[in-house]
Amino acid sequence: CGHAVLNYIIRDHDNYAFQNRKNHLVSIAEQLNAKWGAGTVELCITDQYYNMKEIIEQNIHLIENAKKACEKVGLIPNVSPIRGGTDGCHLSFRGLPCPDIGTGAHAYHGPYEHISAQSMDKVVDMVIELVKIYSTFSK
């Protein structure tokens, strides 16, 4: 008897759609087990990442100040949502909001992923500006 193991990562910007995607897999497993016999498909869903939008929205100053820091060093901020998958996601849900502020790299997670030394230098400048912004906040 053949055996196959499939691993999927399910992510979505919308929590409702995220749950629907998981429910869809459950439904498929139920249909296949009904057709081919119980145990034909074993499904184990383990949540690893959640959309950190809800955490970041409560701490929007993080995004606003990152945008200011970008502008101070001549970068044009490009704010776009990500679906999770970063250490910052885990930290955000543990009480330390950590939006992904980028690295200056291009073509992420593919064979052409790259970053120039100039881009790395510019990101360092941006982080220094961000630290300066937060250093003016009083506790």
Please identify what each model-predicted range represents.
Residues 1-139:
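Metal-dependent amide/peptide-bond hydrolase catalytic core
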